[in-house]
Amino acid sequence: MKLGLLGGTFNPIHLAHLRIAEEAREAAGLDQVLFIPAADPPHKPLAGDVSFELRAAMVQRAIAANPAFRFSDIEAHRAGKSYTVDTLTALRTARPGDELHFIIGSDSFLELGLWHRYADIFPLASLIVLERPEKAITEPLQQLPELVRDQFVQEAGNLVRHSSGTSIRFVIGTRLDISSSQLRERVARQQSIRYLVPPEIESFITQKGLYQP
């Protein structure tokens, strides 16, 4: 199975998350996309005091109508920070027959050199990098961390190949300027988030009283 992996705090999940997953699925011919909420994100504190259970519930509601989208709570079962390399290692062990494709945005791709044990990520999974139309990455090899650059070769089109056989695929995505922080701020100011999140998520946030000042 070609399995896409989309991680994040999903605090809350919104329409841009869903569109990213759909465009990655279509571009790479993925069979499924696994949504993986971070239990303890390493790079920034979790805003809004919203538990893993509540964020997980929102993800499950948001993806329920799409049979290609699945939920994983794998990071809730591991102590410590939710490092990508640890999650990929666990998934590689649990699903040895699957072809893993980790989905990230172009901003995250350009910061890979700052990630925990980033060099160990590339043999574990291919990457699908969703680019903004106005910020397409040119010369992708030059944007890779210098310490691993010689492990990659440029192939035809939008593909870069790692020496282990995995790849990095660059996909121009639809521009949807929606962020979870923006949504939290709107809720706190009593402003509408309709058409920025699925209806089920808007209702859930209201029912649970999330993101109130």
UniProtKB/Swiss-Prot annotation:
Enzyme class: transferase
Recorded family membership: Belongs to the NadD family.
Classification of source organism: Bacteria, Pseudomonadati, Thermodesulfobacteriota, Desulfuromonadia, Geobacterales
Protein name as it appears in the record: Probable nicotinate-nucleotide adenylyltransferase
Any single biological process term in GO: NAD biosynthetic process
Assigned keywords, A-Z: ATP-binding, NAD, Nucleotide-binding, Nucleotidyltransferase, Pyridine nucleotide biosynthesis, Transferase
Database matches in InterPro entries: Cyt_trans-like, NadD/NMNAT, Rossmann-like_a/b/a_fold
Gene3D superfamilies: HUPs
A molecular-function term among this protein's GO annotations: nicotinate-nucleotide adenylyltransferase activity
Signal peptide start-end: none
EC id: 2.7.7.18
Pathway(s) it belongs to: Cofactor biosynthesis; NAD(+) biosynthesis; deamido-NAD(+) from nicotinate D-ribonucleotide: step 1/1
Role according to the record: Catalyzes the reversible adenylation of nicotinate mononucleotide (NaMN) to nicotinic acid adenine dinucleotide (NaAD).
Superkingdom of origin: Bacteria
Record-linked Pfam families: CTP_transf_like
Reaction(s) the record says it catalyses: nicotinate beta-D-ribonucleotide + ATP + H(+) = deamido-NAD(+) + diphosphate
